[in-house]
Structure formats: structure tokens, C-alpha cells
Amino acid sequence: MSTFVYVPAPTQETPAEFAAEVVRDAIDAAREPAVVIAGALVSLVPDLVLAALRWPFHDPRTTPAEPAITTMACLILAKAWLTLTVSNMALAWLRRQPVGFLRNWVPVQTALRVGVVNIPLLAAIVLGSLVFVVPGLYLLAMWSQAPLAMIDGRARWFDAANYSASLTDGYKIPLVALWVIVMVATAALTSAIGAGLPFLGLGGAVTPITWAVRAAMSVWGAALGAAMYFNLDERAPWNRV
């Protein structure tokens, strides 16, 4: 007589459980000294350069000269490029691979491809948000992994959009929730610093504290983005044994 043993199916992971795992990994990555130092410097150096150049955009009565605008544009591009390297460092740490700024360096050719691909994707996200917020958030979640997919060598050009869509299938809600929480918390903290410190008579501390917050969010943003990609990649159907 045959004996049948009932084996329960594995419990389906909930969005909250996935988000919690991402946050735990992001916290771990954000504690890695190499990631902290690189992420903080990528944020602080442009701020210090602009302060040294007496950047005029803070005063609406001042029209900046063309060299100042060029400097700002170069700093923005350089910061975006180097942020990709910080994210790659965090991803390498999560994969228990050697971590180093030069070791995980993102070549300029890759950074340019990321920019070329993501500009139209961001334009579509903005248009979707203008029509209604939900389509914009949906597109943001769907294409959010395109940059790291290109850095990771899983895609080269616009195939990154399809690869990201496959990775995020079934995980869009927790991804959107995490990014919204981060953006709201950052905006609230920045506003509190800008309004609260002058009220307390500490107006001179607004700028350095704002820089410190930006540096911390630079590290956290890179770690969170890497943790999202790492967990999605681990759960991808084609990577399951």
C-alpha cells in the first residue's frame, strides 16, 4: 500500500518581508567603511567646490556667469557618474566580493550608456506622473533597476528597460513604498533643518548640517539601490536553482 506524505508548499513571501530584507541589506551595506567614505565624498566634494567658488544661484537677484553654469553642469555629471561607482561598491559588498573605489569603478563608457538610456526613461516617468501619479510610480518601479542592470553587465542599451521590468515583476509595490518613504523623510528632514535651526538661533549651522544630511543620504541611497537590485536578482526566476 502506497503511502503519500503531504509536503506543504513554501510560504509566499509578502511585500513587507521583501522590503524588510532590502532594508536590512541596505543597512549592512551602508555600514561598510569603503561605501561610507566614497558616498560621503561624492556628495561633499561638489558642495565644497561650489562653496569655494561662491556659487551664486542661492541669490535670485544674481545672474550667474557662464563659467559658473558650466562648472555646475560638470559637477552634476561627475556626481551622477561617481554615484554609479558607489552603488557598484555596495552591490559588490552584498555579494561578498572585494570592495574598492578603483576595483568597482564604472567606466565612463558605461556611465554614458546609462545616461543615454535613462534620460528617455525618466522623461516617460515624468510624463506619466503629470497625467496621473500612479502611472509615473509604476514606470519608476518598473525601470528602477535599469542602471544597475547595465553596470552589472546584464544589459547594454535599451534592453535594460525590459530586463528591469522582468526583475521588478511582482515587487513594484514594496519598491515604490521604499523610495517614497526615503524621499518624504529626506524632504521633511531638510525642511526641519532649514526652518528649525534659524528659529533656535543656529542659522550658521544650516549649511554644514545640510551638507552632512546630503552625504548621509548619498550613502543610504547607493546602499538602498544596491540592496534592491541584489534582492531582486536573487529572486529572479532565471537565477533559481
Residue ranges and their predicted role:
Residues 1-241:
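Hydrophobic alpha-helical membrane segments
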